Amino acid sequence: MKTSSRRKFLFNSLALTSFPFLSSGINGCTFEKNKLELALQIYSFAPLLFQNKLDVLMFPQMIKENYGINAAEYWSIAFMGKEKDKSFIKELQIRSKDYDIDNLIILVDNIDLKTMENGPSLASSEKVERDQSLSFHKYWIDIASEIGCHSIRVNLRSDESDDNKVLDNSSESISKLIEHSKGQGVSIVVENHGGITGDADWLVRLMKNINSDFVGTLPDF
């Protein structure tokens, strides 16, 4: 698939899976206090992000005033490279505090939006690639810590046909990430949304293999 076609496919997919219409549904409901706690994931508003109608800095106010929700979930791509600006991150901290928003998690996707190519994978059989991916994810662990998130979600994409090798590579990479993250109180979670992670038995083996309080799963229904 050509790059332009892949980009269009991604954007169209995001449009179909997003929920900019949530306002009427949520505002029309009443939830019994202490019975149900909700958070909003900025990925749900991806079309607005790509149309420059929404910025990460707008998110705390948006979910508080439009939906009455007190917890935010983020997506690495939504930062659009602005996470490299320390003043941007500081401003996100300030706005989150001003609107009494708890920041929970960053979904970390290593995708070049210009080429639509995947970046280095934590589950690769090539050590050089795994090391590159480790550096990328450690950076996002630091960002997550700065804005008060308790977790980042990682992907375990691999072309390796041997599931046991993918398990070993993934276990090694995540264990190294935990060495970096645990001092900051940030956990690493794996979502069942593609490839080997869709195998529940394999995912259980991964959790047991790593055996850490700083690793977990994120069910994708």
State what each model feature region is.
Residues 2-151, 165, 175, 182, ...:
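N-terminal pre-domain/capping segments
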Residues 37, 71-72, 171-221:
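Acidic/histidine-rich catalytic cores of soluble enzymes
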Residues 77-78, 110, 158-159, 195-196:
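Conserved beta-strand edge residues that scaffold enzyme active sites
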Residues 84, 162, 198-199:
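Secondary-structure boundary/capping motif
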Residues 143-163, 184, 189-193:
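Active-site groove signature of glycoside hydrolases
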Residues 160-174:
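Active-site cleft segment of glycoside hydrolase catalytic domains centered on the general acid/base Glu
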